[in-house]
Amino acid sequence: MKNLVIIGHPDQNSFCHNGIFGKIKKILNDHPNQEIKTIDLYKDKLHRDKKDLINNYKKLVIWSDRIYFISPVWWFRLTPKMETFFDEVFTPGFAYEFVNITKTYAYPRSFLKKKKIRCYLTHGAPSLPVKTIYLNLSLIHI
């Protein structure tokens, strides 16, 4: 199986790198027929104007059977590089298309449905406020 790991943490000594990614790599290396490729968004210095890098990322997404996202959550958001990755790689025409329902309404149809996705998100906040906010997000109306 082809595995793609996308890391969105700037610190090479972080738990995202040494804990989560290290464990995924060890497990996959211990099993036969497992290929692993890694995208380190901070090491690659991803910026919106890096078209060659973004095209390479799209090729890796197509290549993969499984995609692992590893990122801290800062101020209840993904890191800027991870957000840039989603904005620039998973674009209409590549990851999905809009299917019209009416002239003014459409829904997205995925081109990546067969991919298996796992997300590993870390945070430094106490768990109670995080769980309270995330579990009640659908109840909060701003």
Go through the PLM ranges and name each one.
Residues 1-98:
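N-terminal beta1-alpha1-beta2 submodule of the flavodoxin-like/Rossmannoid cofactor-binding fold
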Residues 66, 117-118:
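Conserved catalytic-site loops of classical short-chain dehydrogenases/reductases
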Residues 69, 107-108, 127-130:
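Short helix-to-loop capping/linker segments positioned immediately adjacent to catalytic or ligand/cofactor-binding
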Residues 102-106:
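Alpha-helical scaffolding within the catalytic cores
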Residues 108-114:
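Short, conserved loop/helix-junction motifs that constitute active-site signature segments
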Residues 120, 124-135:
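An alpha-beta-alpha
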Residues 140-142:
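Conserved small/polar residues in nucleotide/adenosyl-binding loops
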